[in-house]
């Protein structure tokens, strides 16, 4: 058998979106892309919960609480970390990426990583709905596909 994630059958999914307020000029369009994608694929608006956090580092903490609660089928994480002149950029992005991955694996909750890492604000804006598409929408499609595959795997056992 060959299995591939489907973008249908998600009407009853409960989805959490954890989004950073820092760099809101970028994260607000990412959030819009994620919500529009969920709506387009039939997820009931009442089943979408948005959790604003101060910055990218807080994404992991809140995602962990949400995953452990068992209230959500999947989680979308959104943020924008723009490189500066210090090593802070590397510390933040490595911490968030590793943390989100660990939470997903330890709780068996699908969590997709939509935290942009760019050199400039302009690059981030391009990836948040301008010329380079909307990464919030893209990672949300990935989440729906993964949730569908999880369903397929459960049916195998």
From Swiss-Prot:
Q: Which InterPro entries match?
A: LS (IPR034964), LS/RS (IPR002180), LS/RS_sf (IPR036467)
Q: Which UniProt keywords apply?
A: Riboflavin biosynthesis, Transferase
Positions bound to (2S)-2-hydroxy-3-oxobutyl phosphate: 85-86, 127
Kindly report, in one word, the top-level EC class recorded for this enzyme.
transferase
Is the keyword Transferase in the record? yes
Listed GO biological process terms: riboflavin biosynthetic process
- Amino acids binding 5-amino-6-(D-ribitylamino)uracil: 22, 56-58, 80-82, 113
Catalytic reaction annotation: (2S)-2-hydroxy-3-oxobutyl phosphate + 5-amino-6-(D-ribitylamino)uracil = 6,7-dimethyl-8-(1-D-ribityl)lumazine + phosphate + 2 H2O + H(+)
GO molecular function annotations of the record: 6,7-dimethyl-8-ribityllumazine synthase activity
Q: What positions does UniProt annotate as the active site of this protein?
A: 88
Highest taxon in the source lineage: Bacteria
Query: Quick check: keyword Transferase in the entry?
Result: yes
Q: Which GO terms describe its cellular component?
A: cytosol; riboflavin synthase complex
Q: Which pathway does this polypeptide act in?
A: Cofactor biosynthesis; riboflavin biosynthesis; riboflavin from 2-hydroxy-3-oxobutyl phosphate and 5-amino-6-(D-ribitylamino)uracil: step 1/2
Q: What is its EC number?
A: 2.5.1.78
Please describe what this protein does: Catalyzes the formation of 6,7-dimethyl-8-ribityllumazine by condensation of 5-amino-6-(D-ribitylamino)uracil with 3,4-dihydroxy-2-butanone 4-phosphate. This is the penultimate step in the biosynthesis of riboflavin.
Give the similarity note. Belongs to the DMRL synthase family.
Write down what this protein is called. Answer: 6,7-dimethyl-8-ribityllumazine synthase
Species, as recorded: Leuconostoc citreum (strain KM20)
């Amino acid at each position: 058998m060959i299995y591939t994630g489907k973008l249908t059958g998600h009407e009853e999914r409960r989805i959490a979106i954890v989004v950073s307020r820092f760099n809101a000029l970028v994260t607000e369009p990412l959030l819009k892309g994620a919500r529009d994608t969920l709506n387009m694929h039939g997820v009931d608006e009442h089943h979408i919960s948005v959790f604003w956090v101060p910055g990218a580092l807080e994404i992991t903490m809140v995602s962990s609480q949400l995953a452990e609660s068992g209230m959500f089928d999947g989680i979308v994480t959104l943020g924008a970390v723009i490189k500066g002149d210090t090593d802070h950029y590397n510390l933040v992005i490595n911490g968030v990426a590793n943390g989100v991955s660990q939470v997903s694996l330890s709780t068996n909750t699908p969590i997709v990583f939509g935290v942009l890492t760019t050199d400039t604000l302009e690059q981030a804006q391009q990836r948040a709905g301008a010329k380079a598409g909307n990464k919030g929408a893209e990672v949300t499609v990935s989440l729906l596909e993964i949730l569908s595959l999880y369903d397929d795997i459960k049916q195998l056992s």
